[in-house]
Amino acid sequence: MKSPPWPKGKKLVHLDLKGAPPRLEYLLKLIELFSKLGVNGLLVEYEDMFPYDGDLKLLQATAQPPYSREEVLSMQEFAKSKGMEVIPLVQTFGHMEFVLKHRPMWSLREMAPCVSTLNPHRKEGVRLVMEMLRQVVELHPGLNALHIGADEVRIGVLSDSYGGLRHHFFTYSLYHPLRCTCLARGEESKLWLASPGRTVEQLFLSHVTKVAQAIKEAWPDMTIIMWDDMMRGMSQDTLKASGLVGLVQPMLWDYTPNLDVDTTVSLLEKYCRAGMSDLWAASSFKGSTSVHTCVPSTQRHVDNHVQWLKVAAALSAAVNLQGIAITGWQRYDHLSVLCELMHVGLPSLAACLQTLSLGEFSPEAQSKVAETLGISSVEAEAMGRTTEDESLFPGRRLAELTVELNSLLNSEDIRFFENNMYVRGWFSSYHQQRKMVSPLIAMQIQSQASAYLTALQEKVEALREEMVLLYPESTAQEWIVEHVSPVLAPLQRITEDITACVNEMVPSNILPAHNQTASFE
């Protein structure tokens, strides 16, 4: 059923730079494409890729150099030339792993094992956050809005009834908030909460309010946006009394394809009744399926946007919807593995933006997206090129290689090679321990494993060559180690173990020469 198109307001694309930060040349090509797709703003999450200086220089990435000051300015200037507003996202409470992992910052953790959450009681913590913000604002001339994060101020624990750890923070729905096991667990928080009438909700709100007030004192005209999830369970009265009314604009995020429209509308209306009528939505075009997904499902993310269109259509006139941020996480958090990278998420992004523009994702809309990107299918796993014009889809060759390699890695013949009939029947752990095997069958197993390794090696090298053109070399290395090496290792081990066993049973002068396998570590 068709909904009205997305109402007026910003359409922000989220640039998550804490994983696989694009090289500047590629970043500018992406911004050019975003502009053609109807994007009019960027939500930029620098994390350790920002060129912090002074006492904060230790926050800079070490796996690859952060963006230079000149690169940050170039990105902004180019975005503005395309009619885009740039809104930096700087975490100020939760998801501060990239700060609190450093030894000099350990004392600012809420509790020692919790590397994500800032201690809300330390004045040094607020000073740290404000210095981070000061440096970011200084390097964004004419900045009008800041996003201060403040989501997931906790370590999440999911109940068994919700599927255990199969779901991550970013995929829980409004029905299943995660239990807070970090915030309020520190000794100072326990003392603070021991006073009558104090609650964990007040503890969270007091810190966010302090930060927001400090921002307004420093930059009175600055618009402050924050994630809403920590406020979802709070009453209207609690929000009214928080001191946040008039200071912040909540951004409600839900990335699920079956987003509950009624519940989401109810939440937005609650925020509005509490006095926070300027509100934002946040959807997802990639990075919200599972922590290790490599290729996004376009349909899954289109479905998420279809639900958001229903939400927008059902809101009362009192809700002033400022826009929507279409998120594209490269990691779930600073310490997790890389998930879907930008190049392979572009078909999904284009499809989601077209859905917002038309109110549905009709066959005509699909054709328009395919034509815009020069592909035959909007699903990355099935895309084929219809033109050789690379400018239509920056990073298309890398996207193709990612899809091809991902398919190879997930083929049952390769992923479950150790469990096939011949390995289990003629090269079991018992055979290996005794070094007593059927040489002919063992060498046939080895030949097949070597063939798979060669095919993977060729595809990996092609992907590596293409990836380092768009991302830092460290990104290519990490992606391969995380996503490829676990599949290669069993194949490499089998070929080596077969050689050792066969050498015990066949004269070395008549053994066939086998290709040496490469390590991708």
Please report, for each region that a protein language model flagged, where it lies by residue:
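Secretory-pathway glycoprotein ectodomains that are cysteine- and/or Ser/Thr/Pro-rich
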Residues: 2-4
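Aromatic-lined carbohydrate-binding surfaces of glycoside hydrolases
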Residues: 7-252, 283-296
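Substrate-binding groove of N-acetylhexosamine-processing glycoside hydrolases
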Residues: 32, 77, 126-134, 138, ...
